[in-house]
Protein backbone atom coordinates (compact mmCIF):
# COMPACT_ATOMS: atom_id res chain seq x y z
CA UNK A 1 0.00 0.00 0.00
CA UNK A 2 1.68 3.20 -1.18
CA UNK A 3 -0.14 5.57 1.12
CA UNK A 4 0.70 5.16 4.77
CA UNK A 5 -2.57 5.89 6.58
CA UNK A 6 -2.76 6.09 10.35
CA UNK A 7 -5.34 3.30 10.46
CA UNK A 8 -6.93 0.74 8.18
CA UNK A 9 -9.92 -1.43 9.12
CA UNK A 10 -10.40 -4.42 6.88
CA UNK A 11 -12.63 -7.29 7.85
CA UNK A 12 -11.04 -10.74 7.69
CA UNK A 13 -12.14 -11.35 4.10
CA UNK A 14 -10.78 -7.98 3.00
CA UNK A 15 -7.49 -8.71 4.80
CA UNK A 16 -7.28 -12.03 2.96
CA UNK A 17 -7.84 -10.20 -0.35
CA UNK A 18 -5.25 -7.57 0.57
CA UNK A 19 -2.58 -10.11 1.51
CA UNK A 20 -3.47 -12.92 -0.89
CA UNK A 21 -3.59 -15.34 2.06
CA UNK A 22 -6.35 -17.41 3.65
CA UNK A 23 -6.47 -17.31 7.46
CA UNK A 24 -7.46 -20.24 9.65
CA UNK A 25 -6.60 -18.79 13.06
CA UNK A 26 -6.44 -15.56 15.00
CA UNK A 27 -2.65 -15.79 15.11
CA UNK A 28 -2.52 -15.82 11.30
CA UNK A 29 -4.71 -12.70 11.19
CA UNK A 30 -2.48 -11.00 13.76
CA UNK A 31 0.69 -11.95 11.87
CA UNK A 32 -0.72 -10.50 8.64
CA UNK A 33 -1.73 -7.30 10.42
CA UNK A 34 1.76 -7.04 11.95
CA UNK A 35 3.27 -7.35 8.47
CA UNK A 36 1.12 -4.41 7.35
CA UNK A 37 2.10 -2.35 10.40
CA UNK A 38 5.75 -3.05 9.54
CA UNK A 39 5.19 -1.36 6.16
CA UNK A 40 4.50 1.95 7.91
CA UNK A 41 0.76 1.85 8.50
CA UNK A 42 0.51 2.62 12.21
CA UNK A 43 -2.62 0.66 13.15
CA UNK A 44 -4.55 -2.24 11.65
CA UNK A 45 -7.97 -3.04 13.10
CA UNK A 46 -9.46 -6.26 11.69
CA UNK A 47 -13.12 -7.02 12.33
CA UNK A 48 -13.92 -10.70 12.72
CA UNK A 49 -17.72 -10.77 12.66
CA UNK A 50 -19.11 -12.66 15.64
CA UNK A 51 -15.58 -13.27 16.92
CA UNK A 52 -15.00 -9.58 17.68
CA UNK A 53 -12.00 -7.68 16.38
CA UNK A 54 -8.26 -7.36 16.72
CA UNK A 55 -6.18 -4.18 16.78
CA UNK A 56 -2.50 -4.32 15.93
CA UNK A 57 -0.34 -1.27 16.66
CA UNK A 58 3.42 -0.92 16.40
CA UNK A 59 3.72 -1.79 20.10
CA UNK A 60 0.68 -3.84 21.10
CA UNK A 61 -1.97 -6.29 19.97
CA UNK A 62 -5.48 -6.13 21.42
CA UNK A 63 -8.40 -8.54 21.05
CA UNK A 64 -11.89 -7.13 21.49
CA UNK A 65 -14.94 -9.27 22.18
CA UNK A 66 -18.56 -8.43 22.83
CA UNK A 67 -21.32 -10.20 24.74
CA UNK A 68 -23.82 -12.45 23.01
CA UNK A 69 -26.44 -10.12 21.56
CA UNK A 70 -29.41 -10.39 19.23
CA UNK A 71 -28.18 -9.44 15.76
CA UNK A 72 -30.75 -7.63 13.63
CA UNK A 73 -28.74 -6.01 10.83
CA UNK A 74 -24.96 -6.02 10.31
CA UNK A 75 -25.00 -3.55 7.40
CA UNK A 76 -23.03 -0.51 8.47
CA UNK A 77 -21.32 -2.22 11.41
CA UNK A 78 -17.87 -1.75 9.89
CA UNK A 79 -18.56 1.93 9.34
CA UNK A 80 -19.90 2.24 12.88
CA UNK A 81 -16.77 0.51 14.18
CA UNK A 82 -14.47 2.97 12.45
CA UNK A 83 -16.67 5.88 13.58
CA UNK A 84 -16.28 4.76 17.19
CA UNK A 85 -12.51 4.57 16.78
CA UNK A 86 -12.39 7.99 15.12
CA UNK A 87 -14.45 9.56 17.89
CA UNK A 88 -12.25 8.03 20.57
CA UNK A 89 -9.13 9.33 18.84
CA UNK A 90 -10.68 12.80 18.41
CA UNK A 91 -11.19 13.14 22.17
CA UNK A 92 -7.71 11.79 22.99
CA UNK A 93 -8.77 8.51 24.59
CA UNK A 94 -6.03 5.89 25.04
CA UNK A 95 -5.85 3.42 22.14
CA UNK A 96 -7.36 0.53 24.10
CA UNK A 97 -10.36 2.71 25.02
CA UNK A 98 -10.71 3.86 21.41
CA UNK A 99 -10.80 0.20 20.43
CA UNK A 100 -13.41 -0.57 23.12
CA UNK A 101 -15.60 2.22 21.74
CA UNK A 102 -15.08 0.97 18.19
CA UNK A 103 -16.17 -2.58 19.07
CA UNK A 104 -19.12 -1.23 21.06
CA UNK A 105 -20.30 0.95 18.16
CA UNK A 106 -20.06 -1.90 15.65
CA UNK A 107 -21.96 -4.17 18.02
CA UNK A 108 -24.62 -1.57 18.76
CA UNK A 109 -25.21 -1.01 15.05
CA UNK A 110 -25.83 -4.73 14.55
CA UNK A 111 -28.47 -4.72 17.30
CA UNK A 112 -30.85 -2.34 15.53
CA UNK A 113 -32.83 -2.67 12.31
CA UNK A 114 -31.59 0.52 10.70
CA UNK A 115 -28.31 0.76 8.81
CA UNK A 116 -25.33 2.66 10.23
CA UNK A 117 -27.28 3.71 13.29
CA UNK A 118 -26.27 3.85 16.93
CA UNK A 119 -28.81 3.83 19.76
CA UNK A 120 -27.05 5.72 22.55
CA UNK A 121 -28.91 3.85 25.30
CA UNK A 122 -27.81 0.50 23.86
CA UNK A 123 -24.27 1.85 23.47
CA UNK A 124 -24.16 2.92 27.13
CA UNK A 125 -25.31 -0.57 28.13
CA UNK A 126 -22.90 -2.45 25.82
CA UNK A 127 -19.76 -0.36 26.36
CA UNK A 128 -18.81 -1.74 29.80
CA UNK A 129 -19.47 -5.29 28.56
CA UNK A 130 -16.86 -5.08 25.80
CA UNK A 131 -13.76 -7.02 26.79
CA UNK A 132 -10.44 -5.66 25.54
CA UNK A 133 -7.38 -7.75 26.30
CA UNK A 134 -3.79 -7.36 25.25
CA UNK A 135 -2.61 -10.53 23.55
Q: Where are the regions a protein language model picked out?
A:
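Conserved phosphate-binding/catalytic region of the ribokinase-like
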Residues: 26-135
Amino acid sequence: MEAKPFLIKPNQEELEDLTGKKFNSLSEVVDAAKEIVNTGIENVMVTLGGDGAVLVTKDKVYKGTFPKVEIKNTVGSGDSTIAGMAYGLSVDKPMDECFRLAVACGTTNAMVDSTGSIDHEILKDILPKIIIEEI
